């Protein structure tokens, strides 16, 4: 007897455009990525440079990987300190632990700037 399809398998099957009983077409499931934001940063730094779809895929994987590492480290820090909420302090400490030297300093300063901008706009 074949194994039952998981919930993930059912979602993948829903991606195809089929006509349900009520006659309306189904939409494709959206795939979230950082492509738009990576492209915007590229154009700020090098306006005359393009990027291939394979390079964009690699960059997207890289951003997802770094995000997951920072989130996991911040979660660990919150757990160590018996906190149930991850604050900007845990994120900042996680960035300092994960990123090397000068890169961590720049990331922390940019993050602080972004948080300040967000709180002042509220």
UniProtKB/Swiss-Prot annotation:
Q: What does the record say about PTM? A: Monoubiquitination of Lys-117 gives a specific tag for epigenetic transcriptional activation and is also prerequisite for histone H3 'Lys-4' and 'Lys-79' methylation. GlcNAcylation at Ser-109 promotes monoubiquitination of Lys-117. It fluctuates in response to extracellular glucose, and associates with transcribed genes.
What this chain does, per the entry, is described as: Core component of nucleosome. Nucleosomes wrap and compact DNA into chromatin, limiting DNA accessibility to the cellular machineries which require DNA as a template. Histones thereby play a central role in transcription regulation, DNA repair, DNA replication and chromosomal stability. DNA accessibility is regulated via a complex set of post-translational modifications of histones, also called histone code, and nucleosome remodeling.
- Spell out the PANTHER family in the cross-references: HISTONE H2B (PTHR23428)
Signal peptide boundaries: none
Subunit details: The nucleosome is a histone octamer containing two molecules each of H2A, H2B, H3 and H4 assembled in one H3-H4 heterotetramer and two H2A-H2B heterodimers. The octamer wraps approximately 147 bp of DNA.
Family under the similarity heading: Belongs to the histone H2B family.
Residues of this chain annotated as glycosylated in UniProt: 109
Give the location in the cell. Nucleus; Chromosome
In its UniProt record, a GO molecular function of this protein is: protein heterodimerization activity
Q: What is this protein called?
A: Histone H2B 1
Question: Which residues form the Glycyl lysine isopeptide (Lys-Gly) (interchain with G-Cter in ubiquitin) crosslink?
Answer: 117
Instruction: Give the GO biological process terms.
Output: innate immune response
Q: Gene behind this chain?
A: his-11
Region of interest (Disordered), ranges: 1-30
Sorted alphabetically, the Gene Ontology cellular component annotations on this record are: chromatin; nucleosome; nucleus
Keyword Cytoplasm (UniProt): no
What main location does UniProt list?
nucleus
Sorted UniProt keywords: Chromosome, DNA-binding, Glycoprotein, Isopeptide bond, Nucleosome core, Nucleus, Ubl conjugation
């Amino acid at each position: 007897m074949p194994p039952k399809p998981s919930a993930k398998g059912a979602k993948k099957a829903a991606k195809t455009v089929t006509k349900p009983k009520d006659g309306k077409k189904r939409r494709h499931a959206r795939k979230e990525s950082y492509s738009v934001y990576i492209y915007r940063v590229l154009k700020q730094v090098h306006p005359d440079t393009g990027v291939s779809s394979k390079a964009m895929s690699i960059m997207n994987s890289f951003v997802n990987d770094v995000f997951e590492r920072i989130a996991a480290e911040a979660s660990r820090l919150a757990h160590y300190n018996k906190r149930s909420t991850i604050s900007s302090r845990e994120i900042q400490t996680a960035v300092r632990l994960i990123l090397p030297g000068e890169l961590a300093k720049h990331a922390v300063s940019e993050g602080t700037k972004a948080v300040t901008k967000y709180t002042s706009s509220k």
